[in-house]
Design a protein with these regions (language model features):
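Hydrophobic transmembrane alpha-helices and their immediate loop junctions
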Residues: 1-137
Length: 137
């Protein structure tokens, strides 16, 4: 990534998108499985500010590696605690995978018609793939 203002802005948008989708789907899945904790704490939202961790954000800026604020989950609310905890944990990485797939399809369609893909789509796709790889470790 270069350090011109446009690249920095595109990187920031990609990070906010990936982080927000990832954390939102942890919260959404927990809520659907019976745990209202994240909803009660205002985390069941697509507002990126609700999901930013100050230290994780600074690390993203400095090292291009960081994290969001962990979504609070209380397995005591789940009907099947072991299974539901795994589903909640998997929801974030799965959301990144689905997003990467969607942006990959968009990128391929644009290439097929010889339309240059927006740097945002390329950066977002690369970021989502990296996020998936990190979550699989």
């Amino acid at each position: 990534m270069s350090f011109d203002p446009k690249s920095i802005l595109l990187f920031a948008i990609a990070i906010l998108y990936a982080l927000t989708i990832h954390e939102f789907f942890h919260a959404w899945t927990a809520n659907k499985l019976g745990d209202p904790t994240a909803k009660m704490q205002g985390r069941l939202t697509l507002n990126p500010l609700a999901h930013l961790d100050p230290v994780g954000t600074i690390c993203f800026i400095i090292a291009h590696f960081g994290w969001g604020k962990p979504v609070p989950v209380n397995p005591g609310y789940f009907k099947h605690p072991r299974r539901d905890d795994v589903l909640v944990s998997a929801a974030g990485p799965i959301s990144n995978f689905v997003s990467a797939f969607i942006f990959g399809v968009i990128f391929q369609i644009l290439n097929k018609f010889a339309i240059e893909a927006s740097p945002l789509i390329v950066d977002l796709g690369n970021l989502l793939i990296t996020t998936i790889q990190i979550n699989l470790i």
